[in-house]
Design a protein with these regions (language model features):
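Transmembrane helical elements of multi-pass membrane transporters/channels
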Residues: 22-41, 147, 181, 210-214, ...
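Short runs within selected transmembrane alpha-helices of multi-pass transporters and secretion channels
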Residues: 75, 147-166, 174-185, 203-216, ...
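Generic alpha-helical transmembrane segments of integral inner-membrane proteins
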Residues: 28, 32, 36, 40, ...
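Helix-loop interface residues and adjacent transmembrane-helix termini in multi-pass membrane transporters
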Residues: 36-39, 48-51, 85-88, 167-168, ...
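Helix-terminus/linker motif at the lipid-water interface of multi-pass membrane proteins
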Residues: 32, 36-54, 124-135, 191-198, ...
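Short alpha-helical transmembrane segments in multi-pass integral membrane proteins
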Residues: 1-24, 82-151, 195-250, 317-384, ...
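Small-residue hotspots at the loop-to-helix junctions and early N-terminal turns
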Residues: 51-62, 141, 145, 204, ...
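Small-residue-rich hydrophobic transmembrane alpha-helices
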Residues: 54-114, 155-174, 289-355, 388-407, ...
């Protein structure tokens, strides 16, 4: 059995609670800080540009999520495979995995940047920049997206390397890399928006500057890793190797990609039905579009905590699974799902009690209609978040122990099979039953309905996995 120490922590014997905290907290902070990139932009844009600017960032946001999905597919998959490889004592496979992940991330980042820049107008239209939002919002979206697209390779590299750095036993370095970029973004945002008067373009430039800093710090660390030594042969792409680690991160990609699909569908439905509702000021969907974008930002904050806690434990669960310490994997699973549910309860209370206070962080000079819709959106759309926390955690845990089929299946059910059809069908149903002005409520109900169904299936799969780990533990003890 291999042993791995991180500082003073031995992953096969240190207390599970302490080990979880050691890995999860830096990861949570890293992902929270990453989420702040978009949130800080939107806060400054809300105060310095207005609702049209916030609407523009809402249109662009799914496209950054798509880039994140590709990056996390490579990074989380490599992280899981590296941890399992180190747990079984195969360092050669570990360093080749890291090298392949680096090259693959760079290639994907450049290709995605070119696609975004070449096909910008039709892409933005696909994600909600239609005639039902104002021309000003559409123009802002184009200005913002141009610079965000240029920064995509740096953004993807920083996000993909973050879990790999954690798998090398340096969660604090991963956290510091992300934190440095976010601090730069927070400092540069007001300078670019309020002093240089660059409106939404300034927010995008500040974001890209922060992403470059994160990428540079990641490169510096990769040159002197602790557990892994990279060489020229590490960077030679090997199909058989990528075939093994990419499926382990496919759930991360699928989760983000399906979120992109549901957000694209949501943006278009909000634009259409928002303009028909009592919240559609001036006959446009600008107000509902801006509010839904902000609600999604707070949802992303919660998801950053949830995913951070789960992804931070990938090296711990993966290493112990590879080392046949099934008792520790089972205990980690039990604690993880419990903690995630409690996190969801805390966020639910915040969303239900303080919706107006939350929305006012993004500007306090909007109309009463704007705040009325914010209250409705927070309280309906996010009412099932404790169950969603358990679902998201289940996806990642199953991925970490080399169960991509179950993990991918759950993610597909949540985001593709349920979320996308429901966000399209329910507004039509509500329109037929209650009139065109109430179609917007069908959009808000779609998410909790998808979550409840997915939660039921996730509980069944989790219980089976828990029993399997217990059986494997018994087999291991009988051999010993």
């Amino acid at each position: 059995m291999s042993e791995k120490k991180t500082g003073e922590l031995d992953l096969t014997s240190a207390p599970i609670g302490k080990t979880m905290l050691n890995y999860a907290i830096p990861c949570i902070i890293s992902l929270l800080v990453a989420a702040l990139y978009n949130i800080v932009d939107q806060i400054y844009i809300g105060w310095g540009v207005g609702a049209e600017g916030n609407g523009a960032t809402s249109i662009v946001f799914p496209l950054t999520v798509l880039a994140l999905g590709i990056a996390t597919m490579i990074g989380d998959g490599a992280c899981s495979y590296v941890s399992i490889s180190l747990g079984s004592g195969d360092k050669d496979r570990a360093h080749r995995t890291v090298g392949n992940a680096i090259v693959l991330t760079i290639i994907c980042g450049i290709v995605l940047m070119l696609i975004y820049l070449i096909f910008m107008t039709p892409i933005l239209r696909m994600f909600g920049a239609t005639d039902t939002v104002s021309e000003l919002t559409r123009n802002y979206a184009k200005r913002y997206f141009t610079w965000i697209a240029i920064g995509i390779p740096f953004y993807m590299f920083g996000q993909a390397m973050n879990p790999i750095i954690r798998s090398d036993g340096s969660p604090r370095v991963a956290m510091a890399a992300t934190l440095a970029g976010a601090i730069a973004n927070i400092i540069l945002d007001p300078v670019a928006i309020f002093i240089l008067k660059w409106d939404v373009m300034g927010a995008a430039v500040a974001t890209v500057a922060g992403q470059v800093i994160t990428a540079v710090i990641s490169i510096v660390y990769l040159c002197k890793m602790k557990e892994i030594t990279l060489s020229k042969i590490s960077f030679k792409l090997k199909a058989s190797l990528m075939k093994n680690f990419i499926p382990l991160g496919f759930t991360s990609f699928l989760s983000q990609f399906s979120l992109v699909l549901s957000m694209a569908a949501m943006n278009n439905m909000v634009s259409k039905y928002g303009a028909l509702s009592r919240f559609g000021e001036g006959g446009t969907g600008d107000t509902p579009m801006a509010v839904v974008g902000i609600v999604m930002k707070f949802f992303q904050i919660m998801i950053s905590v949830v995913v951070g806690m789960s992804a931070g434990c990938i090296p711990v669960s993966g290493f112990n699974y590879g080392a046949h310490r099934y008792d520790r994997v089972r205990e980690l699973m039990r604690r993880l799902l419990t903690y995630e549910f409690l996190v969801g309860v805390v966020f639910l209370l915040i969303f239900e009690i303080f919706p107006v206070q939350l929305i006012k962080l993004f500007g306090n000079s909007y109309s009463q209609t704007y705040y009325d819709f914010a209250k409705v959106a927070f309280r309906i759309y996010l009412c099932a978040v404790p169950l969603d926390c358990v679902c998201k955690s289940s996806f990642i845990f199953l991925q970490s122990v080399g169960k991509p089929v179950q993990s991918t299946g759950l993610s597909l059910l949540r985001e593709v099979v349920l979320a996308v059809p429901l966000v399209i069908i329910l507004p039509w149903v509500f329109t037929q039953l209650f009139g065109s002005e109430n179609g917007i409520y069908g959009i808000l109900v779609s998410m909790p309905m998808a979550v409840v169904i997915t939660f039921i299936v996730a509980v069944i799969i989790d219980l089976r996995m828990y029993r399997k780990l217990k059986a494997l533990e018994g087999e291991e003890n009988s051999i010993l």
